[in-house]
């Protein structure tokens, strides 16, 4: 007897390219496939804003999404999402999200998606690859919430792999790998993991002035309710937040990002 048919999974791909003409950034390349789209709202200012939209309504077991962003010399791209990305319960297969970002000479990319929300028993593997020119600027913020705290859901089990690799001028300057799997509720309660907190976030800022802005970043964290801290080395600045729920973390992070960037977050963050 033939086995059960394989379930249909969502596959999506987006490619966004931005160049600079007369000091203003413009879209130079767009490609979309499957259930992933990118929309460019009208915004004031020199940057192109791209909003990633998942028409599948979330990410389920076995889904695979690929995102490529390239800022050509002197261009500035800001990439965001209109809502939290929901990672639904899996019956065994792992969803994958692959992000590749290229930032050429004098260009800038701000990677500012809203939080990733992991449902109980979700399985996700994400990989970020970032290639920077020596004088490029890259700012990324990523937040993860474990379980729907507002609905009383504890993430009892699940799987998360989160890999970051950043090169500048062809040399590796940052690599970070997180892997938590199995009884996540128990793991998150451990003092050496999350001490019972249910949301965490990472900010990475790579720029010629990154190390010089460390005191500024720490000062902006002084009034935060989350546990947080920042450090800087080798032309990059890294900051982390840890909070009991995503609402607390989000309030702290929004205040930090608005001040640190010197500009408000994309309007979709307020929807």
UniProtKB/Swiss-Prot annotation:
It is found in: Cytoplasm. It comes from the Bacteria. Pfam families: UreD. The keyword 4Fe-4S does not apply. Signal peptide: none annotated. GO terms for cellular component: cytoplasm. Its main location: cytoplasm. Coiled coil: none annotated. Belongs to the UreD family. Required for maturation of urease via the functional incorporation of the urease nickel metallocenter. This is Urease accessory protein UreD. It comes from Azorhizobium caulinodans (strain ATCC 43989 / DSM 5975 / JCM 20966 / LMG 6465 / NBRC 14845 / NCIMB 13405 / ORS 571).
